[in-house]
């Protein structure tokens, strides 16, 4: 049976703006060693402040005022996804922008959830991912007064498990990339359903999005210059129920400088859309809930997609430098989790996807984009700096480690102790193990406690002797 739209005879235009600024690592971090660096010595505060101040003026203030003007005049709506790190820096450097965001929310704009640290936490630990999303959702609720209904994983990273995990957290709609091999013959311009759960999925129309995000200022492009009326006519002629246009918010004044005409494009686009009866602006949740899903968007975990580069994970995990760095980050997580406090905060800051993005080694347009964002000029330099930061985190953990933290340590599967069908992943489980089992494997267990739980030999012997 043909499923008809609940919002028939029109197309919902969903503008989705991604707002994120990382804390960049200081390139001369190695000079602090062997002393343990402070947060100020580790992160490049001067550069972050300079970049943020420039972007706040060119983008966050000017573009947001343009959107507010369009909201008042033609009823513009859109969806924002703001990382927790961007919110922190807005509070510090541009609190007036937060007031502008609150005014957007009061006029029907929507704010979505994502990971607080714009991180790769999904690939490390499910509960860590949950906590980071909850942190960011809480920050959004504090900002605009409601909990988000729409969520994305960092950089639109998506598979079926991501969608259903976010659905289990209460988010009704998940936003991701409209990948050709996933869609096949189908169009990105419809609402889909996640495989395995009832989450609704909106997928980005990457061609129309990249016309703004990447090609707007490209004089070699046969459609340059891109004007608001031309773009609105493309939207009007696009078949489907929903057109999701998702771009970095920094597109409007930073990636494309004001001299390119990008602000005038942003100013006139809502008006050009408003005068076309077939088009209407909607938030992501309105569009997802206003149309019945047409089919299933099926992305198995072994084929995870994103909106970057080749629509996969290669932007962050595509070469040996990146994979080695990420493996160490992942290895350190249980220890940072056990210690908490500054160690966990530092681990989370280092989980920000940008640090691995800077380590990509790519040619062509993708390589140019990586180079544009990197403050280091070289993937190899970015890797060295990041590994120094992980070394500093390791030193911090070792400096404060104690039996108390060993008691809190919950190991991943790779570091658990396995023998005779028994699996031990914590000191609590060790105490509950059969005494005969512990005697038979005493030497191996002792080495495990020293190497993995970082206990000295006396504490290791005590742990083996202790009963539940």
Predicted regions and their residues:
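Active-site and substrate-binding clefts of carbohydrate-active enzymes
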Residues: 3-58, 189-199, 203, 218-220, ...
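Short, well-structured secondary-structure segments
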Residues: 12-17, 22-125, 149-152, 172-177, ...
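An acidic- and aromatic-residue-enriched active-site/binding cleft used to recognize and process polar
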Residues: 18-22, 83-85, 114-119, 153-163, ...
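Generic structural signal for well-ordered alpha-helices
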Residues: 64-68, 98-102, 130-140, 163, ...
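Acidic, His- and aromatic-enriched active-site or binding-groove loops in soluble protein domains
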Residues: 96-113, 134, 146, 167-203
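Short, charged, surface-exposed secondary-structure boundary motifs
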Residues: 122-124, 182-190, 211-213
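CE4/NodB-like, metal-dependent polysaccharide N-deacetylase domain
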Residues: 128-157, 165, 233-246
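Acidic, low-complexity, intrinsically disordered interaction modules
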Residues: 427-441, 447
